Amino acid sequence: MLRQFWKPILDQYKVDLVLSGHDHIYARTGDIDVTNIKNIPTGYQQAYDPDIGTVYVVSVSGPKMYEVTKGQYAKRFAENTQLYQIIDLDGNTLRFRAFTATGELYDEFKLQKREGQPNQLIESNF
């Protein structure tokens, strides 16, 4: 239901980054094609949309964590790992970093706004 109502609004306003929780895992979408993938979790049906430039992240910081079945719908996964995020803005660039509870960098990407074009997703090498 949330996807049905929120996704069109997020697309209309070209939202850069969607942060959510309550899945008890860490997962982040990336530049992937989800049109032919089966059994995609609810929050990832549209994953990263290169025509819009939205990235979706779900994270966990509490003690309750689940194992995850890795799928093609997310670029980066973590299970049984508490994470926190730091987001920096510098002009037209959003930098996202996810760290483990012990301070180890786990995930990083940048979103670069481009006038008249979708955001450019710049992946860090892991």
Please place each PLM-identified region on the residue numbering.
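C-terminal domain-boundary segment and adjacent tail
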Residues: 86, 95-126
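Long, structured stretches of catalytic cores involved in phosphate-ester chemistry, encompassing
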Residues: 1-105
